[in-house]
Amino acid sequence: MVNHKGEVQSLGKKSEKCYSYYMNNIESAKEFATRKFAEVNVENHFLEVYGFLKEDFKVNDENILVAGLLHDVLEDTNTTDEEMSEKFGQDVLNLVLEVSHVKNWKDPTRPEMTKQDLMSEYYEHIREIPGRAKLIKIADFTSHMGNFIKIYQKNEQHLYPKFVNNDKYITQIQNFLNSCEDSLAKEKLWKLTVELEQKNRLSAFNMLD
């Protein structure tokens, strides 16, 4: 006869093993991203994006969380698709690819495409990506919007002219959100875009005084 208590203990050990594997993947992704960005001397907000996904949006899909940590790695470092796939699996790679644009906004296979062309193409692309990838992009944009608002709060907009009064960027994000299913994540980001719009208008008005 199987001892019920023994079954519970066995299930408990399996659960602990799964949790340990889950955390090892998360920690491995944090270490990987930290090392890759250090190699190219670039600061990145990947921990903040991870925080929005896990704490604010209550995401428990491990691959989404790992991809959130790695979402800029292909764009901004020398990491290859093969390297990421081998270390974190094809699903994580696919999620990161969905939210990534070409490096430095230059496509060597289409030299005639300008940066503006590629950016327009990218914002059209993210409207069509799967919902799991959209969650990562919402977290990414949420981080950016929050940081832009902090610039205004610190009255430092003169130090970051390209990050403020950028109504086109806000419109692109809102167009993206219109393609997303309703969620608390979508609502949070939408409110931030509206707040930044208001700060942009106030800043422009003050410049006229």
List PLM regions with ranges.
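Acidic, Ala/Val/Gly-enriched low-complexity intrinsically disordered segments
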Residues: 2, 7-8, 16
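Active-site helical microenvironments for divalent-metal-assisted chemistry
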Residues: 12-209
